[in-house]
Amino acid sequence: MNSNSSVQFNEQGVPVSTTFDDIYFSVESGVDESQYVFLAQNGLPRRWLSLPAHYSFTIAETGFGTGLNFLLTWKRFLEQAPANTRLHFVSFEKFPLSRQQLEQAYQLLEPIAEFSQSFLEHYPATDPGCHRIILSQGRVILDLWIGDLNELLPEWLPQAQKQIDAWFLDGFAPAKNPEMWQPTLFDAMKQTAHSGTTFATFTAAGSVKRALQQNGFEVQKVAGFGRKRDMLCGHYLSAEVCQKYYDRRDVTIIGGGISAACSALALKHRGVNVRVISAGSADGASGNPQGAVYPLLHAEYTPLSRFYWQAFSTATSFYRNFCDDHWFPVGVMQPAFNDDRARRYQRIADELYAPDTVRYLSQPEAEQEAGVSLAVPALLYPKAGWLRPAAVVKSLLETAQIELIEGEAKALEKTESGSWQISLKDGSLLAAERVLIATGHHINGLLPESVNPLPIQPVRGQVSLVQTTPLLSSLKTVLCFKGYLVPEDGNHHCVGASFNRDREDLEPTPEDDEENLKQLAENAKQPWAESLQLTSQRVSVRATSPDHQPVTGAVAENLYVITALGSRGFTSAPILAEVIACQLTGELTPLTQDALRRISVSRFKG
């Protein structure tokens, strides 16, 4: 599924596409070219100076290439836009460069070196789909869509109506890359334009000029950069004033786990006043001592795999940004304990995903990577890892600087104005403009009678903590089998977890500890997995849905839910929080329409 660009570097060090026989940026000065063609001809940074508070200025680009336009725009925005505004940059790229190719290209881009190096730290694996990267403490968002523009635009368009403030039409020249300059693109520009939308492109091709005019744009031909004589720029001609919509009304979140914390931060980034009601932070599974973050990948490229891969891509960048002290990207390994599993793992690694996402390791390679003895080959997620759940939740809530109300919500009642009244168990009442419920398997207990219950199933899980040993202390990666084993933290390892459907009891049992340790020993079949000393345990209840997908979205006017994150809550919470925050504020989500439907509350209706 991965399609990297064929690139060579000429004598000047400029990257050249061998596919399109064209350079990625000017030999004279790529930075100056980008500044002149794309920023200046779109009226930037001048237009930023008059943006209203909390406005998200949104740019769409065709052809991410080396990311030069994004990097320069990011730099200029931080330097010159009002501090209470945000930048959302959406870029489409069919042939992504590898990290190594970017590193080489950036050697010529010294004026933006600080930003190029920061971006490289977050550059994702180049698998298809949208990679959402949150930068500059949430003030800048990059949505990097990998794939064919003509296939991606129809899935992206429904949520992008009148949302784009400026278009950067890059990519290679129409004569060399005609597949990109199709009616699909120009129709998308028309649908996403509002009264203030502008565009700029390096080309002056007559076919491009005519297509833009036919789709409602006034087109100007101006002097090109350097040796190029002409280029095109212009703005959308709207018969009526059509303004971009955005909503910043207050939100009250009920819940104290990872989905609540991520949602609070995502909303706070967008200028929304947020308060969180919780009996205590890091409740439920979010309070476990250690947790693994890795995707769910199948031997076929299924919608479920696609969602969890995308969630994983967002999560690893997110935790690096906001919880670096409690995030350990040491890799996650899935040993292949039988031949059938080995064949499936090899197909996943060799045919479906990029090496930066997943690699198949022989038995000696797996043993060396894990740091402990292993008898079988394994699948390795090199960018995955583990975190400290309670510390992560606490850190996110502190970063968000939101109002935290200690208490337990008992009921919700809709008011005549369309807002909500929240009753707490201590008898107090709170008024809320909008409410987001993030209480896991308890969610149906808070839904008003007018809302149909959601098909959420509780799953009880017990994790066991064991004392480290001389053999076990050398474990470097998370090991996942039917359960999991996490590297040492404070002389202890977390072993988990039991899986008991339709149980909500929170009392630990010796039987579950015995099963966790037995399962580890039987799967590993190694001396380090034997005679482990149990030190403590913890029980929590996860929420799951019938189709194993999370559940998000509106259940009533001004009432939203986020639940059913299951056993991969720390993998999916960051992207789900972005989705719900975008839906609440009127911004672009990082998911396709199909993916949004699959996690929507509405899939259970009818």
UniProtKB/Swiss-Prot annotation:
Residues 1-237 are annotated as: tRNA (mnm(5)s(2)U34)-methyltransferase. It is found in: Cytoplasm. One of its GO terms (cellular component) is cytoplasm. Its cofactor is FAD. Its EC number is 2.1.1.61, 1.5.-.-. It holds the Pfam family Methyltransf_30. GO terms for molecular function: flavin adenine dinucleotide binding; oxidoreductase activity, acting on the CH-NH group of donors; tRNA (5-methylaminomethyl-2-thiouridylate)(34)-methyltransferase activity. Keywords: Cytoplasm, FAD, Flavoprotein, Methyltransferase, Multifunctional enzyme, Oxidoreductase, S-adenosyl-L-methionine, Transferase, tRNA processing. Its main location: cytoplasm. It catalyses: 5-aminomethyl-2-thiouridine(34) in tRNA + S-adenosyl-L-methionine = 5-methylaminomethyl-2-thiouridine(34) in tRNA + S-adenosyl-L-homocysteine + H(+). Residues 254-606 are annotated as: FAD-dependent cmnm(5)s(2)U34 oxidoreductase. One of its GO terms (biological process) is methylation. PANTHER family: SARCOSINE DEHYDROGENASE-RELATED, TRNA 5-METHYLAMINOMETHYL-2-THIOURIDINE BIOSYNTHESIS BIFUNCTIONAL PROTEIN MNMC. Catalyzes the last two steps in the biosynthesis of 5-methylaminomethyl-2-thiouridine (mnm(5)s(2)U) at the wobble position (U34) in tRNA. Catalyzes the FAD-dependent demodification of cmnm(5)s(2)U34 to nm(5)s(2)U34, followed by the transfer of a methyl group from S-adenosyl-L-methionine to nm(5)s(2)U34, to form mnm(5)s(2)U34. In the N-terminal section; belongs to the methyltransferase superfamily. tRNA (mnm(5)s(2)U34)-methyltransferase family. In the C-terminal section; belongs to the DAO family. This is tRNA 5-methylaminomethyl-2-thiouridine biosynthesis bifunctional protein MnmC.
